[in-house]
Amino acid sequence: MENKDKKRQKKWLLIAAAGILLLITAAAVCVYMLPIGVLPVKDYSRMEALPADHLLTAEEVWADREQCIRIVEETHPYFITAEEQSGYAAAREHYVAATNGPMTAGDFQSATAEFLCFFGDGHTGVRWVEEEYLNLPQVYADGKTWNVDENGVRLHSVETIGGVSVNEVYAAIDRIFPAENEMARQRNRQQRITGRNILTLAGAAIQDDTVTVTFSDGVEAEYTFRQPVSNAVTSQEGSGPINRWYMDGDVFVIDFNQCNDDDEMKAIAADLKNAVDHGQTKVIIDVRGNPGGSSNACTRLLNAMGMAAPQYDVLVRFSPLAQQGRGYFRQSGEFCFTGSDAAVKRNESVRLAVLCDRVTFSSATMMCVYVRDGGHGVLIGEPSSNMPSAFGDILYFSLENSHVNACISHKQFIRPDEANTERMLVPDIQTDPQDAYEAAMDWLAQ
């Protein structure tokens, strides 16, 4: 009898051990297969830029070119999803031809930026730095650059800068900076046209830090370079990553400047939930000028209003760079997550207006897509420069010899409304970004 008990006990111990081993194996497989960060993340440090006229040897150029091509082909989801890749082959061939010998660091950076621009991905490109801009107040509108007065009123269109046609400067900008849609192209031109490095690349004459600009009325004027970094005229760009809420009459307004899912955002969401639970029916979420961050901050706000967002389809590509930056176990392959619309939950008692502009990007654009595809409210303002379905989740890298700093996507996000392939998310109510808030208040007053 005692021997039978021992055998039975041994049997159950073996079964338990096998079960534990099976669970460990299943967990290990999940950790390996899923995009879960389990390994230590390698800190990325941006390399200090070399002087633009620093001469790279042919060997240094070739080494950096091959490093860039290898990282791109190992990392970007394009190589998983694109059935036709002849366009990339041509871009690569052009890059190789343009970097086939000794050249300056500035010229190599420009060639690399043009190569990365092929993907038309706002999350992939050279991290171009401009330290000085012409002190020319300007705005890009109707296909032209206009100088403006202190009130932002257009005066005359710019014809030449430093003796170079403004169209040649546009062409240089379009070659260097990726644009996912027409709004992105307009934003790039407005932000970049007065940068010293771009003007130098376009061949503009610069004398003693002064550039001559001619206008459509025939007038010539001299402008000098200045700091700080940007002179772009946008609704809220530069307002800083500070999120807050306030009441404007009977409207709960969230000034959502950056998608940080932090304690500050949790407190805002808690206050919003409390307000909705006690009868708040009018809400504005202002993502004008919001460059993105974590989409969890967006879903947190929707959940606080008794809403649930539809889900994106997501493709994650594993690579050595992604392993360094995210701690994935795998260095190759991909993982696909298929989103579900079944989770969508609306709250018909809440009237929601989301304000957006061309600077709204990445996770902030996702907020707009959640609202549009989930039927949660209306969008007011101008389209985002980010496509509704887009590449994203940035990884950073630097090229060893040239010190070119760049970034690249390792995921692809497909919007919940998969059949909609529009490149721009056009708001329900289109207005100048500066007028979006007033338009939202008018809509909520109806």
Locate each region found by the language model.
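C-terminal "post-core" interaction segments
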Residues: 39-48, 55, 59, 66, ...
